[in-house]
């Protein structure tokens, strides 16, 4: 599961770095937000899976669900 997530993230970052355009502005903003979250200065301050959180930005590549960072593939 982690390998699949890592491959997806790598492919997304490669598509962003090559200048590939997305037709949907919302998708583009989401991809930019993901890139900024993973590569930005706050990336060192985020928690991994099962860490305590208040919002999605508190989690590294995960979602904040009921005060805990969870994998993006697990629904709240």
UniProtKB/Swiss-Prot annotation:
Q: What is known of its domains?
A: The cysteine framework is XI (C-C-CC-CC-C-C).
GO CC entries: extracellular region
Which family, according to the similarity comment? Belongs to the conotoxin I3 superfamily.
Query: What's the protein called, per UniProt?
Result: Conotoxin Ca11b
Q: Which PROSITE patterns match?
A: I_CONOTOXIN
Keywords, A to Z? Answer: Disulfide bond, Secreted, Signal, Toxin
GO MF assignments: toxin activity
């Amino acid at each position: 599961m982690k390998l699949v997530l890592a491959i997806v993230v790598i492919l997304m970052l490669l598509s962003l770095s090559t200048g590939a355009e997305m037709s949907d502005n919302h998708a583009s903003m989401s991809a930019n937000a993901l890139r900024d979250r993973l590569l930005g200065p706050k990336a060192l301050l985020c928690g991994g899976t099962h860490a305590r959180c208040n919002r999605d930005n508190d989690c590294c590549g995960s979602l904040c669900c009921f005060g805990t960072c969870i994998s993006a593939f697990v629904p709240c």
